[in-house]
Amino acid sequence: MRKTYPDLRSFLNVLEEEGQLVKVTEEVMPEPDIAAAGRAAANIKNGPAVYFEKIKGYKYSVVTNVHGSWANHALMLGMPKDTPTKEQFYELNRRWDKFPVKPKVLGREEAPCKEHTITEDINLFEVLPLYRINSQDAGCFISKASVVTGDPEAPENFDKLNVGTYRIQVKGKDRVGIQALAFHDIAAQLEKAERKNERFPIAIAVGNSPLVTFMASTPIKYTQNEYEFVGALQDGEPCEIVKSDLYEHLYVPAGAEVVLEGYVEPRVREVEGPFGEFPGSYSGSRKQCVVKITRITHRTDPIFENLYLGIPWTEIDYLMALNTSVPLYKQLKADMPEVVAVNAMYTHGMGVIISTKCRFGGYGKAVAMRLLSTPHGMPYSKVVIVVDEYVDPFNLEQVMWAITTRVKPDKDVAIIPNCPGMPLDPSSVPAGMHTKMIIDATTPVDPEPNPREVEILDPPAKSEEWEAKIRELLGR
C-alpha cells in the first residue's frame, strides 16, 4: 500500500484495491441519484467512495464519499483500513510535529491540472457535472473544493497563502458565490482587498489529493501554510503545487482535476443560499461575495469530486473530525501539558470531549475555558465535556459513565451566555451568538489546604508614625 497520494486518482485506485470504492457504470440522473448515493454510502459502516461513470446530460464523471468512513480516512494516512480512530488521532499528532515541509513547485508542463485550458466562452456546466445536493438548496453547489487566496497586504508572503474549504454556489456559467463567514481567513483577506477597492484574486481547485482536501478543512493559524502541513502529514514528502496562470502569488495543487481562476469584485454582494449544511439543517440565505471565473484549466476527462451534507454522520463529519481534534489538542497541550487527548469529531467541533489530569480543584473547567478561547473553539465549540485522564474521550460509553458518576449538576455544569457562535447552527439565535456549556466530569480534586480561620493582617508597628513622617517630608 502506498503511503502518499499525489492526486485524487491515485487515492481512488487504492480505495478500489482495498474494496473501499464502488463504480456505477450505468447512466444515472444528477438529481437525486448522486446525493442519494452519498447519503446511502454514509449510512453503511466503513462506507465506500462511489464513482459514477456516466451522468445524464454531462460529459464527465463524479465521485462522492471519498473521505466518508474511518476505513477511507485510515487509507488516506497510509494506514491499514481497520486502524482504530484513536490510533489515527495519535498518528496525525505525531506527523503534525513535522510541520513545515516546503512544497515542491512543478513547472506548468509537469502539472496534470494544466493539461487543458479554457479562456473563452467559459461554461462551468460543460466542465463540472453540477447538481443540487439537497432538494431545497438555492442551486448547484460545489461543496468540496480547495479555495486558494492570498493576503492583499502581503501577497508574496507564502505563509499567508490560504487554502480553505468554503461552500460555493454556482450562479451562472462563469459566476459563483462563496460563503465567507467573519471568522474565516478568506473573509479577513477579502476585507483587506475591499478596503482598497481592489479585485481579490482567487483560484478554486476541485478534486484534489486527499490530504490537500483534509488540510483545506483544518483550523490552523493564519500564518501557517496548508501545503506545508500536507507535506508534514505525508510524513515529510512534499506536496506538489504549481503557480496559477493568472496570479504570480497563488499556487494550486498540481494534481487537481479542475482549477477555476478569477476574482472577487470588491463590495459586490448577492444573496447566497439556502443550503443544506453540516449541522443537518438548511442554513438560510445571506448576502455573500461573488467570483467571476475568467480561466479554467483541467485534466483530461476530469473527475468532479463533491460531498453530501446532511444529518450526521456524512462524509463531511469524517473529513472535519480528527483535523479539528488535533490542532485543538496541540493548542491546549502547549498551555496545559496535563491534557491527554481531544475528541472534537462532533459537528465540526461544536461538541468537544477532553481528557486531562487535574492538577488542582477546578482544573477541568479551566481546560474547557481555554478551549473556548482558541481560534476554532471560540466560534464553533458549544458543548465541552472534560473527563479524567484514564477515560477515553473516543469511547462514548466511558464518557457517559464519567458524566453519570462524576457530575454534580449544581457545581460541575457551567452555562456561559452571549458568546461568539457558529451562525450555521440552527440554535444560534441571533445567528452568530451562542450560549456555551461546560460539563466537568472529572474526579474532584481537593483545594489547597487551609485549616485556619481567616486572620486579618494588622499594619506593622509604627505605621502611623511613618505615615506622618512621609507626609511631613512631602510637605502635605
Identify the meaning behind each predicted range.
Residues M1-F275, G280-V290, T294-R476:
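Extended, highly charged
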